[in-house]
């Protein structure tokens, strides 16, 4: 037999991906690789709904708790680490199960995708340009060299990255976008959700996080440099509860804004994953969910 396909469990936040991944690992003798960028961070446990050791049920989980909150997550680094892990897991006769809602990270592990290099000095110059002239000026500059990216990108960091890539390579950033072509055989299982039910679940989950000590977790991480972390400080719940620590929001206000932001994030995740025709969708509340998913992964 050849190498088995990589399994990816995808879908919106709160849909039960982590639990399905564990059940598939138990069923298929697998190990789990985390593809949720915010779960890379040590100490970001409550707010990211990170799977606990007990919930892992003895299944090895990789790429959890690998970064300090001051470190920046890198899709390129993740691609290297995930592919090495996939090879190692397969070499031991086990199934590699990727799980997470960070769409680009999933694509980086599964698809043919190249990452242009970086230049810290160039990045700093572009950040200085942003501070001096504003987003509109940088977007206009990007429009001249890469109109596709200028139309698609709204986040300042990504606009800077697109300009950096163009200056480094002479190619538009959009030319590096991934093709829907697997790097090695893969099967993707998506959890299809009822949006109204998901919205209720996400609200309940945020309230449970608050009751479990999210504010204290954010306070502790703030002492470890959370605000200076370019990736970690943007995590859902953490940015909102930093405002509580600053006295600019109440706990109730931070919880409500976290619920709204989480629902918006779930919609963006669904839009991203629904665009991939290779994903097979199964209802998240299907009583035969594990058996159906295992069947797809065994074909």
Curated annotation (Swiss-Prot):
Cofactor(s) annotated in UniProt: Mg(2+)
UniProt GO molecular function: ATP binding; tRNA dimethylallyltransferase activity
Subunit details: Monomer.
Keyword Cell membrane: no
Similarity remark: Belongs to the IPP transferase family.
GO BP: any one term: tRNA modification
Domain of life: Bacteria
Protein name from the UniProt record: tRNA dimethylallyltransferase
Residue numbers marked as site, Interaction with substrate tRNA: 102, 123
Purpose: Catalyzes the transfer of a dimethylallyl group onto the adenine at position 37 in tRNAs that read codons beginning with uridine, leading to the formation of N6-(dimethylallyl)adenosine (i(6)A).
Statement: the UniProt record of this protein carries the keyword ATP-binding: yes
Keywords: ATP-binding, Magnesium, Nucleotide-binding, Transferase, tRNA processing
One Pfam family recorded for the sequence: IPPT
Entry EC no(s): 2.5.1.75
Sites where the protein binds ATP: 11-18
Gene that this sequence comes from: miaA
Residue sites binding substrate per the record: 13-18
Substrates-to-products reaction catalysed: adenosine(37) in tRNA + dimethylallyl diphosphate = N(6)-dimethylallyladenosine(37) in tRNA + diphosphate
